[in-house]
Amino acid sequence: MKKLNVAVVGATGMVGRTFLKVLEEEKLPVENYYLFASARSAGSKVEFMGKEYIVEELNENSFDRGIDIALFSAGGSISEKFAPIAASKGCVVIDNSSAWRMVEECALIVPEINLDAFDNARKIVANPNCSTIQSVLPLKPLNDKFGLKRVVYTTYQAVSGSGQKGRDDLIRTLKGEEPEFYPYNISQT
């Protein structure tokens, strides 16, 4: 099996760090890892796979090195700008933001449900919202067996879904301080 070159975009954020943890556990056939983030995080060091990596600033030339797969977790605006650049250079982009979820040309994939919908030619793969993923996993076998007609599903979204700034705001407001990220006190909703 060919060894892959894998990039993590947003490597210093909460989701990016989780990507790194999962990659470390999975032990995929990888030749090189490339860790990208914002200018603010560029130059920071990340311990990963027993090595120290220096995080690079993401830019238009970041994907000029034969990257096969890029995991994006840096927010919708970053994905909208850089995913097409990566895809145009042959990279398969797996995007964790909402940027590509409603774009017909992009596959919306939950691997346990519809991996067969993946088409390498499309290059940009979106994943659904986390609450959608957790709902379709048990619903798929029920639908296959019984043919569901309608599902009513209610979720409560975690503040962590808005990233580190959301978590910081929750902690801040729990201490009685004013919010800086949310327009209201998230701990009182």
Question: What would you call each of these model-derived segments?
Answer:
Residues M1-I186:
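N-terminal Rossmann-like NAD(P) cofactor-binding subdomain of oxidoreductases
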